[in-house]
Amino acid sequence: MFTNIIKIKISLKSMLQEFNPCIPEYINDVCKGRCCDGSSGLMVTIHETEIDKYKKFGIKIKDNFIVSDNNKCPFKINNLCSIHNDKPFGCKASPFTLSKNDVLIVRNRYRLLKCYKNKTEKSKPVYIVHRWSLEQIFGKNEVDKLIKYIESGKQNIYLSLSKEKYYMLKDNDKYKRIKK
């Protein structure tokens, strides 16, 4: 029988990495939305299923990436995303990615940012701070399971996601490797 659901392993080590809360006050006062800026320029992935949607915003797209005259995200206004709930899947899924072994991890570049490096008393594990992103990937019920598993001390955690989301996660990195 065919299924549209895939189970992937979750890196417990990654889920326990602490980040400062990604809230407007912290973004404006400290990090300035640095996660939206790539070290080598704008790298916002637009998936095939998203192209028409973002072209309606008047955005230029080339080879599955947003193209900008000033190399900045056109949706970033005053350090915040002006289309937060409607942003591209690649942005929604951040800071998460799949390793080469299909394990969900935190993307390496996020550990170079202030939200990770400069711990405060408000720092929390990434599965709490970026719960919204996890819900965009897996859905609320799966994330509720993740939290239950982590809090109960379970070591080997697997969550289900749609094939569509799985391939979108894979494509996020594939497109970036091609662009480099």
Feature-to-residue mapping (PLM):
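Short loop/turn segments that flank or connect secondary-structure elements
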Residues: 1-180
